[in-house]
Amino acid sequence: SKYDMTNSTFKKEEVNDLLVKGLNSQGDEVPNWDLQIFGPAGGVLSNAEDMTKFIIAQFNEKDKELKLLREQTSKINGKLGMGLGWFIENPKSNKKRMFRHGGNTGGYSSMIIVDVKNKNGIIILSNVTSRNPYFENINKLAASLIKNIRN
């Protein structure tokens, strides 16, 4: 692949033995969702190594495709905008601008945050569903990590 993300796929059967079991709100294992035609909206199976490669690719300002994804297409408010799949925090500030995308499926949650200007990134991959009582810890961890990379 263009970014050498050899551990990422839509085909569960290719990585089934490597998957961490997803957990519901009671902490019980749940089956993976089969999203079929909606696969690109939540069916990517990946790992921290490949997500790191994806973050590093964001730092290449010559990559027109990735740069296009980060262009603001709509404004939510003064401190938040939207790109193609990215929430853009502080879109008017080159110094504090960050790009964020999170996801949830049955038994899993994830967050990726990219600071292109300072070449920093955060990846959080969890087998905790958004309805799990521990899910809020993921948001707290993300907020704490953002604060640390900004300082």
Task: State where each predicted segment sits.
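Basic phosphate/pyrophosphate-binding loop/patch that engages nucleotide-derived ligands
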Residues: 1
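Catalytic loop of the DD-peptidase/beta-lactamase superfamily, centered on the K-T-G motif
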Residues: 4-11, 17, 24-151
